[in-house]
From Swiss-Prot:
SUPFAM superfamilies: Urocanase
Gene Ontology molecular-function annotations: urocanate hydratase activity
Cofactor binding note: Binds 1 NAD(+) per subunit.
Organism expressing this protein natively: Pseudomonas syringae pv. syringae (strain B728a)
Domain of life: Bacteria
Pathway where it operates: Amino-acid degradation; L-histidine degradation into L-glutamate; N-formimidoyl-L-glutamate from L-histidine: step 2/3
Full protein name: Urocanate hydratase
CC cofactor: NAD(+)
Gene Ontology annotations of biological process type: L-histidine catabolic process to glutamate and formamide; L-histidine catabolic process to glutamate and formate
Amino acid sequence: MTENNQHLKQDWTRHREGVVRAARGTQLTAKSWLTEAPLRMLMNNLDPEVAENPNELVVYGGIGRAARNWECYDKIVESLTQLNDDETLLVQSGKPVGVFKTHSNAPRVLIANSNLVPHWASWEHFNELDAKGLAMYGQMTAGSWIYIGSQGIVQGTYETFVEAGRQHYDGNLKGRWVLTAGLGGMGGAQPLAATLAGACSLNIECQQSRIDFRIKTRYVDEQAADLDDALARIAKYTAEGKAISIALCGNAAEILPEMVRRGVRPDMVTDQTSAHDPLNGYLPKGWTWDEYRARSVSEPASVVKAAKQSMAEHVEAMLAFQQAGIPTFDYGNNIRQMAKEVGVTNAFDFPGFVPAYIRPLFCRGIGPFRWAALSGDPQDIYKTDAKVKELIPDDEHLHNWLDMARERISFQGLPARICWVGLGQRARLGLAFNEMVRSGELSAPVVIGRDHLDSGSVASPNRETESMRDGSDAVSDWPLLNALLNTASGATWVSLHHGGGVGMGFSQHSGMVIVCDGTDEAAERIARVLHNDPATGVMRHADAGYDIAIDCAREQGLNLPMIGR
């Protein structure tokens, strides 16, 4: 390490005790709502109700952080409080690096996280940079300041389970059960999603603290003492037709093979451990969590090897379930790739969830539309729920989702909601929310964003763009164009990341957030952004030859020069 890097290494802090929470109400800390919004959402990402490990700036997904270190966090906060409405803050891998004069319709923040030149886009190189304080893993919504807790993925998981039920069980999951693992920020959505879809679930998690958190937030119903107890509960509840979620503390690489040996037959098998990051996110079998964390620092290469070997056993068990005729699918954590790298040559014999169940939605620009109430008042969300029903009156499935979400989903941090809606609907809802702020029906502005897992904002050959019809799985021009268009359209902040969901070298993706502050200027920006953003998804899928997307483009009047109009 050079002398300069040695100084850099000593000059930053990853761990700091204390509680970060976003302000509530209408009193501003920043100069306007356009800068108050990213400030509150950054802080909300680190709220103890939201983040997995807030003292180390980790929001979710292994080491997905909101800022590179605490010094950078403090400077981001300072910069946002001082930022004028004709200036733009640039954030490079969680570090505020510049403030530039732009104009009032430009984004207030532009973020680039974890991006590496392709030849160097590996965990090994990233971890070297990370150790020197030169990079930060932003996951998808951690480093882009629009994570809303496990609710953010609940509906996508719910839609997946419902569609799997339609395809395999005549649309009825009553008396069925899902086997899965991982109860972190993303995987924690699975038990509740299964329950809402009408199924029981057995959810394996190696950290008791995560099980405790999911039970506290009502994402998990109960915990079993051991595998025998878990299977007995599953047998009882499925026989009774109840949809109950059960957590089991243990290692999936040990428990799934044991279930195969016993001849246990779930009705659906998937996984959402943090397998994308073998150094930080997947516990090798036979190890304790404390041992894993210590050895990841002292002997990272051996830790990665051990984690991948355990993943191989995990995937082999999933393959055995599939070969027994049980619907089995990857839920986007790249576990198949990790297993393949250590010799499981047929790891990709079971599909990813997007080509299996979700792509028809993406073809219509339908994806994870989310919003948060900057007031902190849950009533603002309930009023927007009602507005969604009013503006989309004939979608019974969506109405059921909103009713179930209100009944079952606990808000984490600032109250927020997610619902999957598409091109045309997003702009209508955004303009309506803005009018509700203008009229005073909502007590403060709201922000509208989305996951990077959306129809036009990601290139990820092992997840969102797996098995594209034209073979364009790895073409990453599309998320770059999405980020550029959202910037040109006037989103309040725009992000461009690498490695989210599936790890370094396997994805590029972009995000946007826009503020509804009740002004005419906001309405103009909302109309542009919330049309153009999902339209890029329709464009991307139409370009790949999907008839559903081509029809949608024609219906919505999109100008796609190479697509016959």
